[in-house]
Amino acid sequence: MKYELQHTDGAARAGLITTDHGQIHTPIFMPVGTLGSVKGVHLHEIKDDINAEIILGNTYHLYLRPGLEILEKAGGLHKFNGFDRPMLTDSGGFQVFSLSGIRKLSEEGCEFRSHIDGSKHFFSPEGVMDIERTIGADIMMAFDECPPGTADYAYARKSLDLTHGWMKRCWKRFNETEPKYGYSQALFPIVQGCVYKDLRQESAKFMSDFGAEGYAIGGLAVGEPAGVRYERIAGVYGLVPAALGR
């Protein structure tokens, strides 16, 4: 994956991400295809009418349904859904947040119950990397915890330590494994830290040290005031590599 910064205007940036499945002009609107396809529209509308250059799939949901065996047999998510342009998968971290009543977190990972049938499952950082390799998106997200915007400092501190520990394990597993379908994949670390400036800055510096091909700023729009959200985004811009997609 390659990123080219083309224009700037203050803090605003326009750039071009190049993947093996095509190019993404940033900033970009990314339609959400939770289960691999975008609901309510045909694929040709996504490609021809909306001209979506990338869509998002969800690791948690794709793992449960249709499942990894079907996805691998199809040759990955691109072949499964017929979308031959870039794709991104989130790691399931937001679902860890949203399913708080049916999950249990530890340093090892996250134990949760399926929202479909109540069956028990376990996500570890290594396991999520393997799942995302099987799904086959061009851009993979690291496994993280997304704390609520109302979390107190003690919880946010503990959550960030968990996310940082998981990131080390994600990075190791990612570099120990290869893409399954003949094209490259990139892993993006995710900056967390809730609404706390010092934690956000600590996380931005920590994640930047991995030398990844791009970065995500996560844990936003989860209950915090809009003004705080924008402050926290602005507060990490200078700490995340400017020459990369983010």
What residue spans do the PLM features occupy?
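Glycine-rich phosphate/ribose-binding loops and adjacent secondary-structure elements
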Residues: T177, Q185-R246
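Non-catalytic, usually N-terminal nucleic-acid engagement modules in DNA/RNA processing proteins
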Residues: M1-K180
